Amino acid sequence: GTKTGQGMKRGEQWPVPSTIAGVGIGLRTPHIPEVLDTTPAIPWFELLADNWLAAGGLSLDYLHAVSERYPLTLHGVGLSLGGTDPLDLGYLANIKWLKERCGAVWYSEHLCFSQFRRHHYHDLCPLPFTHEALRHVIERIRKVQDFLGEQILIENVSSYLRYRVSQFGEGEFLARVAEGADCLLLVDLNNLYVNQINHGQDARRVIDCLPAQRVREIHLAGYQEKAGFLLDAHNHPVAEPVWWLYNYALRRWGQVATLIEWD
């Protein structure tokens, strides 16, 4: 079996799949019949795990049919990876089952919290960049990886608030989490740009901090302009400054599997 988490010996490597490459898109329900009917030349699709796990959710027959034709990845929003409630092992068991069922190459989740005392927020709340949060989330990611038996990808989120105390910049925090938990990174460049405009941080400096060998995927999306801030809305084309960041990132990291989000 696969050695996992804290059981890995120094110098040993996790098995890293390599069937996801090029530019993929998120698979949304209205498109599935057309995708199955016409088999468009798209390298890979991302599945939103929570859509498939929901009660009365999508037909697993569809899932099987798509998985026979395309490589897939699994993306989650429901784990509350940085939260203080106990990890939901039932949810994780469902993720593991779904991943095995569709043969997804990897599973990614957001570095955030989305519930507190079992109350669910309809938002992905950012973590404070502190030593305490760092230790906490590293421990939780290790537990998740031990449960799943593989590395996961963690994604940076957009932010619309600032904490009073920050002991790291966002890039250093992400890098320390990835190294400490021995996990991989999904870098959302639209979120970095949104945070640059909203909070004045330099997205390029965040990119500079991230270890290239940990970056497994990039997300691109469009933002929405609000009164005095940007919103990560996924309902606009990718903006020119985000394409510029993408070019900057690829010069540093080489070719990275990329997903364009549109909702």
Model-based region annotation:
Residues 9-97:
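N-terminal pre-domain/capping segments
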Residues 29-31, 49-51, 60, 78-80, ...:
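Active-site-proximal loop/turn and secondary-structure-junction residues that shape catalytic pockets
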Residues 32-36, 163-179, 195-208:
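Distinct, well-ordered alpha-helical segments
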Residues 34-40, 57-74, 90-105, 144-147, ...:
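Acidic (Asp/Glu)-rich catalytic clusters
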Residues 45, 107, 188, 218, ...:
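Conserved, mostly hydrophobic/aromatic
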Residues 54-56, 71, 124-134, 195-253:
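Gly/Pro-rich active-site loop or hairpin
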Residues 88-185:
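Active-site acidic/histidine proton-transfer and metal-coordination neighborhood
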Residues 257-263:
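Conserved active-site loop/cleft motifs that coordinate metal ions or position small ligands
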